[in-house]
């Protein structure tokens, strides 16, 4: 029973460490297609074979950044080999995270609904 709680905590710690290390390693990339990228989260498979890295872009094109990051995944994984003290370093798969866009859209919809409600109550 005790091992069942340890494994998820270790996975969370490893994913957090990968998130921090990948963010630092991206700064070393010279690819002009990669704009200002923020690593939002990392999801790792239980066997540490694959990691989905979710990112957002402040400046630059999301599709170009995703392509460039996936092309640089081998370089970034090699950097993780040097930094992490685990037996298997996962293969990195980068995905653009649309959470911030969706949050802005929902916020705008809520604002519009509140404005309509205020207009309806005034009439």
Swiss-Prot record:
Main localization of the protein described in the UniProt heading: cytoplasm
Sorted UniProt keywords: Cytoplasm, Ribosome biogenesis
Gene: rbfA
GO cellular component: cytosol
Oligomer and partners: Monomer. Binds 30S ribosomal subunits, but not 50S ribosomal subunits or 70S ribosomes.
InterPro entries in the record: KH_dom-like_a/b, RbfA, RbfA_dom_sf
GO biological process: maturation of SSU-rRNA
Record-level Gene Ontology MF annotations: ribosomal small subunit binding
Family: Belongs to the RbfA family.
Protein role: One of several proteins that assist in the late maturation steps of the functional core of the 30S ribosomal subunit. Associates with free 30S ribosomal subunits (but not with 30S subunits that are part of 70S ribosomes or polysomes). Required for efficient processing of 16S rRNA. May interact with the 5'-terminal helix region of 16S rRNA.
Source organism per UniProt: Leptothrix cholodnii (strain ATCC 51168 / LMG 8142 / SP-6) (Leptothrix discophora (strain SP-6))
Protein name as annotated: Ribosome-binding factor A
Domain of life: Bacteria
Localization annotation: Cytoplasm
């Amino acid at each position: 029973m005790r091992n069942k709680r340890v494994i998820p905590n270790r996975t969370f710690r490893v994913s957090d460490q990968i998130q921090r290390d990948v963010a630092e390693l991206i700064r070393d990339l010279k690819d002009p297609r990669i704009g200002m990228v923020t690593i939002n989260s990392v999801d790792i498979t239980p066997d540490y074979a694959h990691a989905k890295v979710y990112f957002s872009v402040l400046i630059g094109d999301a599709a170009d950044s995703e392509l460039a990051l996936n092309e640089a995944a081998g370089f970034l994984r090699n950097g993780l080999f040097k930094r992490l003290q685990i037996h298997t370093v996962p293969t990195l798969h980068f995905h653009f995270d649309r959470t911030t866009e969706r949050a802005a859209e929902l916020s705008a919809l809520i604002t519009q609904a509140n404005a309509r409600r205020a207009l309806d109550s005034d009439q």
